[in-house]
Regions:
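Structural motif marking the loop-to-transmembrane transition
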Residues: 1, 143, 249-253
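Radical SAM [4Fe-4S] cluster-binding motif and immediate context
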Residues: 1-141, 148, 153-154, 161
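Flexible glycine/acidic-rich beta-alpha junction loops that bind and position SAM and/or redox cofactors
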Residues: 11, 58, 110-115, 146-154, ...
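A general structural signal marking secondary-structure boundaries and capping sites
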Residues: 20, 38, 167, 192, ...
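Acidic/polar loop patches that form or flank catalytic/metal-binding clefts of enzymes
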Residues: 73-75, 141, 170-173, 240
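Noncatalytic linker/hinge segments flanking ATPase motor cores
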Residues: 87-92, 116-124, 140-148, 181-189, ...
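Catalytic-core region of carbohydrate-active enzymes that cleave or remodel glycosidic bonds
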Residues: 164
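Radical SAM enzyme core and accessory elements
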Residues: 183-186, 193-278
Length: 278
């Protein structure tokens, strides 16, 4: 079940159109209304679809406290700075948090700065943040974008190896997408680097297909590099390697079942959704 508590995000990443859509608006539904909605659900496993549940710490604390008596299991999207508050992490675990989606995006400092996500570097490093999630039994779904001006063909390998070594529950390796309304789109359009504008209206658009000209690879190499990284991450051997995590991925029978089911579904969907010319 999908449940929404709040809208908007306090950050302004270069590739994201959320700020263009909501502006500086950060709003939450009354917690009592969200609780009532969850109580009406028969199956108590939910995905909280907020762009960033941790947009405001005070509201996040109040929300997590309200979830505790509901005995719900939940997943959602958070920014990496949530790991800086140990008490909040304990509360997340107590409230039923099973997994989080975290936008790591890149291991390259220059790329993070260009995408206006340099704040990812402020919190003791990725490894320390991942450890804190795992120490609280929370599985991590890491996402990466490829195609920024400092990215090259080696970037796929580095991000893939990092995701496997970190034993991410799931991971996605996406081509940078110039979404209308995002600063990235305006910049690439001004530089004449869009392949097909407006690409989102094209009947030829396929999932995972690069829509601009990167600086250090061809669009075809960007598309193929992301596809190969997804495929390798979801190989049976790497699924097995990532399952060897008794703190999070296999910390309980429920975690283990969710890990295996999600990875097998992901493996199937990669082939099903990918562009057909690869």
């Amino acid at each position: 079940h999908l449940v929404q508590y709040g809208r908007g995000c306090r950050f302004n990443c270069d590739f994201c159109s959320i700020k263009a859509f909501y502006g500086n608006y950060l709003g939450q539904r009354p917690i009592k209304d969200v609780v009532k909605e969850i109580e009406s659900l028969k199956f108590k496993h939910i995905f909280i679809v907020d762009d960033n549940i941790f947009s405001y710490k005070k509201q996040a604390v109040e929300f997590f406290k309200a979830l505790v008596p509901l005995k719900v299991r939940w997943s959602g999207q958070v920014s990496i700075d949530v790991t800086q508050d140990d008490e909040l992490m304990k509360l997340m675990q107590k409230s039923g948090c099973l997994s989080v989606v975290v936008g790591f995006e890149s291991l390259d400092k220059k790329s993070l700065i260009q995408m206006k996500k340099g704040w990812n570097l402020r919190y003791g490093g990725y490894s320390e943040a991942i450890k804190k999630f795992r120490d609280h039994g929370i599985m991590v779904y890491g996402t990466f974008v490829h195609g920024y001006d400092h990215d090259n063909l080696d970037s796929f390998k580095y991000n893939l190896e990092f995701a496997i070594e970190s034993k991410f529950y799931l991971a996605n390796f996406n081509p940078l997408t110039p979404t209308p309304g995002a600063p990235l789109y305006d910049r690439l359009k001004k530089e004449g680097r869009l392949i097909n504008d407006p690409w989102w209206l094209s009947p030829d658009f396929k999932y995972g297909q690069a829509q601009f000209y990167p600086k250090q690879m061809t669009p075809e190499e960007l598309t193929e590099g992301c596809f190969k990284a997804r495929t390798e991450f979801n190989s049976y051997s790497n699924i097995f390697k990532r399952s060897l995590d008794l703190k999070a991925n296999f910390s309980s029978p429920y975690h283990a079942a969710m890990f295996l089911a999600s990875n097998l579904i992901s493996k199937r969907e990669i082939r099903k959704k990918q562009v057909d010319y690869l």
